Amino acid sequence: MNNKNIEIVTDSAAETIELGERIGTSLKGGEVFALIGNLGTGKTHLIKGISLGLGAHDPDQVSSPTFVLVNEYFGREGLIHIYHIDAYRIDSVGEFEALGFEEYCRPDSVVLVEWADKVLPVLDGVECIQLQLEHVSETQRKIVVQNAPAYLTVS
């Protein structure tokens, strides 16, 4: 991992999805992403793009698992498991650990955690690629990538 911050501004939801797709295409498996941002900043759009880049068959099925907490998608001919975790409704770090977070972190999976700021103590022990999303305007989003591996494609 490197500690360089990379800033990208997207001008629409479609561009945010395209950015996610570029990121997903470059992944090898074993990555954990911590997505942080307020409501409506594009976390789920970015995850939809990452899933598409990983070869998910139906990216339209990608939705925020706010009530079920974890969605699983399959990419690259079933070889990559994509775990989409939404920590928005999680009340404690213990509840997050009880989801089996560590079991999802495998070489054949990519783990994407929305609202990761709520569970940072658990993520501190894991090498995470952090994606911080912010509103710039009604349509623009600033995405700051931290701790990205050298092979990660963001531009």
Map each language-model feature to its residues.
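Hydrophobic anchor at the beta1->P-loop junction of P-loop NTPases
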Residues: 33-35
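Phosphate-binding P-loop
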Residues: 24-29
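The conserved Walker
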Residues: 39
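Conserved lysine of the Walker
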Residues: 43
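N-terminal pre-Walker A segment at the start of P-loop NTPase domains
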Residues: 2-20
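Switch I (G2) and immediately adjacent beta-strands of P-loop GTPase domains
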Residues: 67-91
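Post-Walker A helix-loop "phosphate-sensing" segment adjacent to the P-loop in P-loop NTPases
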Residues: 52-61
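Short phosphate-coordinating micro-motif centered on Lys-Gly-acidic
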Residues: 4-6, 91-155
